[in-house]
């Protein structure tokens, strides 16, 4: 293992030297090839600067069973990057006078009359300030609910009685249910399916011929399969029925089609300037979420940042990141069909190349300790983690990837290994509620209820509106 880590380190150091001897396109390609070589990226990437595509390339396999490679026109599921498209579509209907931003949910969907969310406005749903919870309010949502097929009405019934997390308009809380609701409103006011309206108003006018709404019964030519990667192996991703992701995560597309979408937003092709500006106006802190986009400065070095509109997306076996830099009409999009991946780190380095900055190609600690876990166990892996963490000249630590590592072990029911990694994560990243929640769930799986209660309480200290932590505590206290 030490030999492989050394090889990785030497390779990355050499790449860092070579980047500046090449032109920009070659630098971008060298960068992405290094990520792919060490199992950190499979998918497609596109970079545009001043309205022109300067680099696009694909890596890895679209289908591992048949050894079919990804290409730049491979279709990927984009998860929550569907939300910017939904927001744009809804604003097109606002522009046409079919929807009003300050109208209430009950005005469009009678099923919500006399329900907690009845008075929530369209504006609040768009900006995640409605107080409508996310699906983690339901225990074991993914194994119990996400794999089922629903009609629109049936899925609305799953959450329409949910208590709001706060008074609408007073706070920010991300809610995929909120965007499913917006998709349903689009269907109600047009009398057409969300898929059809999206095609008529956005995909067809922009020539986004490789984009659409996915359902598992469809045959979609050139659509990538989704995989999970961890501990040195690829796994076929879990199934999710996309009937419960309409408006929030059911879109498939390509990097080239998303470039067309970016240009249309830049040129006000779809929306007038007033609505476009409103969409990209920063919302409530901390997320600064406008309508379908996080609108805030994106920090790509310790001292440099750029004004950006961005969104990330994650769905079974896929992870994606779409970032616009409006001041220079530039963009970066990465679509990956092996999750997880360091989408923030990749994007930061792509922007570094765009701005002629030094590329920080360091060895990722989480990748190195994966091999230690496989070969020598989690305790040894944590010992090596502590050594590599100190070597900041050659290694970097990504809290999110360390969190994903504990979650992968948990999903494989390797609870003791998961506990060791998650306990280290809790010490290293004490302010991350996801990290505390991960450890609490692992303790619960190990029947260490007192420890689980302690960390569910910590989750609520960090994030008072965590519905999953609230629900778990209620169950544990009752028991």
What are these regions (language model features)?
Residues 136-220, 243-259:
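Catalytic-site signature segments of enzymes, centered on catalytic residues
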Residues 411, 445, 475-479:
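Register position in tetratricopeptide repeats
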Residues 22-57, 187-192, 196-200, 204, ...:
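Catalytic loop of the DD-peptidase/beta-lactamase superfamily, centered on the K-T-G motif
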């Amino acid at each position: 293992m030490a030999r492989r880590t050394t090889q990785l380190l030497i390779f990355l150091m050499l790449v860092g030297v070579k980047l500046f001897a090449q032109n920009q396109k070659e630098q971008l390609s060298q960068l992405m090839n290094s990520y792919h070589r060490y199992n950190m990226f499979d998918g497609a990437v596109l970079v545009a600067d001043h309205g022109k595509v300067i680099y696009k390339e694909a890596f890895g396999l679209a289908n591992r069973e048949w050894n079919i490679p990804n290409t730049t026109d491979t279709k990927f599921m984009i998860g929550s990057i569907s939300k910017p498209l939904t927001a744009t579509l809804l604003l097109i209907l606002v522009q046409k006078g079919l929807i009003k931003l300050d109208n209430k949910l009950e005005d469009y969907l009678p099923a919500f009359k006399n329900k907690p969310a009845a008075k929530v406005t369209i504006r609040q749903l768009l900006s995640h300030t409605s107080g409508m919870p996310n699906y983690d309010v339901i225990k074991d949502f993914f194994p119990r609910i996400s794999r089922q097929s629903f009609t629109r009405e049936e899925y609305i019934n799953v959450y329409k009685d949910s208590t709001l997390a706060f008074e609408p308009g007073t706070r920010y809380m991300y809610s995929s249910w909120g965007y499913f609701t917006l998709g349903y409103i689009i269907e109600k006011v047009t009398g057409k399916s969300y898929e059809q309206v999206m095609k008529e108003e956005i995909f067809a006018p922009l020539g986004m011929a490789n984009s659409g709404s996915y359902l598992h019964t469809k045959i979609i030519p050139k659509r990538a399969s989704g995989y999970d990667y961890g501990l040195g192996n690829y796994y076929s991703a879990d199934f999710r029925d996309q009937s419960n992701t309409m408006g929030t995560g059911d879109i498939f597309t390509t990097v080239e089609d998303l470039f067309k979408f970016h240009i249309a937003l830049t040129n006000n092709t779809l929306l007038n300037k007033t609505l476009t500006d409103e969409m990209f106006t920063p919302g409530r802190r901390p997320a600064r979420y406008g309508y379908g986009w996080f609108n805030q400065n994106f920090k790509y070095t310790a001292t440099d940042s750029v004004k950006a509109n961005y969104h990330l997306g994650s769905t079974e076996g896929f992870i994606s990141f779409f970032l616009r830099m409006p001041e220079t009409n530039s963009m970066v999009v990465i679509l990956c069909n092996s999750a997880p991946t360091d989408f923030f780190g990749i994007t930061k380095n792509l922007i570094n190349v765009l701005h002629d900055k030094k590329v920080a190609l360091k060895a990722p600690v989480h990748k190195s300790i994966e091999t230690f876990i496989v070969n020598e166990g989690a305790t040894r892996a944590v010992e090596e983690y502590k050594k590599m963490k100190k070597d900041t000249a050659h290694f970097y630590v990504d809290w999110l990837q360390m969190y994903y590592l504990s979650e992968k072990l948990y999903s494989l029911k390797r609870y003791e290994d998961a506990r060791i990694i998650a306990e280290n994560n809790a010490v290293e990243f004490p302010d991350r509620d996801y990290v505390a929640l991960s450890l609490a769930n692992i303790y619960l799986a190990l029947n260490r209820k007192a420890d689980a209660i302690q960390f569910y309480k910590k989750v609520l200290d960090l994030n008072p509106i965590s519905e999953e932590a609230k629900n778990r505590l209620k169950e544990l206290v009752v028991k």
